[in-house]
Structure formats: structure tokens, C-alpha cells
Amino acid sequence: MRLLYATDASEYQEIPVAVVLPKNEDDLRVLIAFAREHRLGLIPRTAGTSLAGQVVGGGIVVDLGRHLNRIVAFDAGRRRVRVQPGVVPNALNPCLKPHGFLFGPETSTANRAMIGGMVGNNSCGSNSIVYGSVRDHLISTRGFLSDGSEVTFGPLNAAEFAAKCAGPD
């Protein structure tokens, strides 16, 4: 299996130390603790459709697309959808279309690229002049830091930004 994850759509190749396919966030927490204890790098990955080699490396490849691929919540009134990193745009848009919505970034790999990788790359596509890139459709993103703590990244108002700047490093 490590050979399958030694490359992406680029020409780069490096066999990872291991490959992990977490089924839930608890698996991720355990993995982060293990990697930290053993001083191993984690390489998050979804479909591996990028041409630049971002998901290739000698650490532990973490395939977030295999099992974490659900549309978690949709609120048409608030114009919000929450997805896991393994959701494919061509699976998301048919759910949004009856409500008059669209996830605009339409890459040439929209039938296999996954939202997690698209966020990491700020992907766009042939319609980006009209619909923008992923950052134009992203309100917040949630993840884990190397100490296992959960973090949400999103917009800050001026007071929140000042508080972050004044806080501990």
C-alpha cells in the first residue's frame, strides 16, 4: 500500500513511512499523539490529484478521503454546508443544485478531487473568473494542531484579531 501513496498526479515520488486511513476524529487524535511521540511528520492527503507533489513525502501519509467523505450538514437558509475532507465536488453539487446553490470551483478533476485537498491548494478552475477559488466559498475550516488540540480557522473582526496578536505565542 505504501507504493500506492508514494506519488500523486505529479512526477514526484517518495515512499512514506506508513499510510493511515482514519475512520473518524478519534483515530486522528491517536495518530497525532503517535506521530508526536515518535517525531514523525504527518502528510494529510485526499485524492492526490494535484500536480505539484504536496502529498508526497517520507512521513506518515494520512488518507483523509477514504472514510471521511460525508456531507455533514446543509442549511439552505444560512447558505451553509459542512463537509468532511473526502467529499468530491461532483457529489456535493447535485445536493446543492435543487436549492439554487453551487460550489463554484470547478477543477478539471471535479469528479475525483476532494474538498480537503482543494482547500489546501485554494483550487479554482475554468469558471474562477465568475465563481472564484475555494477561499471565496470557505467560511471556516477545522483541524488539529500537532499537540492534538482542535482548532477552527475563520475570519476575525478587528477586536478578535487584536486579542490574538496580544495573546501568548
Give residue spans per PLM region.
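FAD-binding subdomain of flavoenzyme oxidoreductases
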Residues: R70-F74, R80-D169
